[in-house]
């Protein structure tokens, strides 16, 4: 299914990161998204940095599709904040847009 998704989706086709399948269900059980009764997993997207730290995760029931452009936006935000410590990407942030420096002065203003 990931192979077909990669071949048919213009956004996914450009992805330069792995789309992981899990035929043994080892990963889906480890991430607690496996549905034992059905023998399948919820739709899960996990962005994990090179140190093994989960930077973003999104889990949907199988009736709800994922938005690849939003996943890519979150991936770019994770990459940006890793390269720019002390900066925060606000909601709907796009690559090249302004970021924030966390401060008590921001509370209630964004």
Task: Map each language-model feature to its residues.
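Chalcogenol-based redox active-site neighborhoods
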Residues: 1-110
């Amino acid at each position: 299914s990931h192979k077909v998704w990669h071949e048919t989706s213009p956004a996914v086709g450009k992805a330069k990161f792995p789309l992981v399948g899990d035929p043994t269900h080892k990963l889906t059980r480890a991430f607690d998204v496996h549905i034992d009764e059905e023998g399948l997993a919820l739709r899960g997207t996990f962005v994990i940095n090179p140190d093994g730290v989960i930077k973003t995760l999104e889990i949907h029931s199988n009736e709800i599709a994922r938005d690849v452009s939003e996943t890519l936006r979150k991936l770019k935000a994770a990459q940006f904040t890793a390269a720019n410590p002390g900066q925060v990407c606000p909601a709907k942030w796009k690559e090249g847009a302004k970021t924030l420096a966390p401060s008590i002065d921001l509370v209630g203003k964004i």
